A protein has these predicted regions:
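Conserved NAD(P)+-binding/catalytic subdomain of aldehyde/semialdehyde dehydrogenases
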Residues: 1-27, 31, 72
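Catalytic cores of nucleotide-enabled group-transfer and carboxylate-activating enzymes in metabolic
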Residues: 1-6, 10, 34-37, 152, ...
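Flexible, glycine/charged-enriched surface loops at secondary-structure junctions
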Residues: 12-15, 19, 46-56, 72-77, ...
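Solvent-exposed alpha-helices and their adjacent loops that cap or buttress functional pockets
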Residues: 13-16, 106-108, 157
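Short beta-alpha connecting loops at secondary-structure transitions
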Residues: 19, 110, 184-188
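NAD(P)-dependent aldehyde/semialdehyde dehydrogenase
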Residues: 24-139
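C-terminal core of ALDH-fold dehydrogenases
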Residues: 81-84, 121-219
Length: 224
């Protein structure tokens, strides 16, 4: 819970991979996690956002969430806009209400997130499908293979460009295996990445050389 709260507040929530929708089982164990998560988030103070315009947009998004009757606020403090340092916001909503409200699918850029309570794996899958293309999906508790974990991995890979297991998504390593992109609207180019070694592919295009002379094929792709 503390790690997740820290991820949401990292950089005042201005990471494009900041967690925004957290699916939690609607049972007693889930209740305990949500309580600990809210307490951990309540104790954090994000630093100032990058500009007054970004802070104003954050405040408008949080105000829209506050006005949504489906939401139950869990962390709901306010902060003077002049400081540019917001207070984190967290609210809880049922899976059915989340799926039915397109307005709740819109990201609030900053330290704000929704806890969606799911009663089954089927509901969790329905929530993921309603969100649409995302940069990341993180799965917790998928250490053992089962029909349910395979189904969750399947929908996660269909939803996001990067699927994490038991971690938080705010760290984006520059590495050969990195994939920072995803199906629309997460990215307009889901077949490439903007971070990692393969990012150079965004600036390349294939060219076929038909019946090329020997001197050209001997260059093995080195430009003329």
């Amino acid at each position: 819970a503390a790690t997740l709260a820290g991820s949401i507040c990292l950089g005042a929530g201005q990471f494009c991979t900041s967690p925004g929708v957290i699916l939690v089982p609607a049972d007693a164990a889930g209740d305990g996690f949500v309580s600990a998560f809210a307490q951990a988030l309540q104790a954090l103070q994000p630093h100032a956002m990058l500009s007054a315009a970004i802070r104003a947009t954050f405040d408008r998004g949080v105000a829209q969430w506050r006005a949504a009757p489906q939401l139950k606020p869990l962390v709901n403090d306010t902060a003077d806009a002049a400081t540019l340092a917001p207070r984190p916001f967290l609210a809880e909503v049922s899976a059915a209400d989340f799926i039915a409200s397109h307005a709740l699918h819109e990201e609030v850029f900053g330290s704000a997130a929704l806890v969606v309570r799911v009663a089954s794996v089927n509901e969790a899958i329905a929530v993921l499908e309603s969100v649409g293309g995302s940069l990341t999906v993180t799965l917790w508790g998928a250490e053992s293979e089962s029909d349910d974990t395979r189904r969750l991995v399947r929908v996660a890979t269909q939803t996001a460009g990067r699927v994490l297991f038991s971690g938080v998504p705010t760290g984006v390593a520059v590495a050969a295996a990195q994939q920072h992109g995803g199906p629309y609207p997460a990215s307009a180019q889901p077949f490439t990445t903007s971070v990692g070694y393969a990012a150079v592919d965004r600036f390349l295009r294939p060219v076929a050389l038909q019946d090329a002379p020997d001197w050209l094929t001997a260059r093995k792709g080195v430009p003329c």
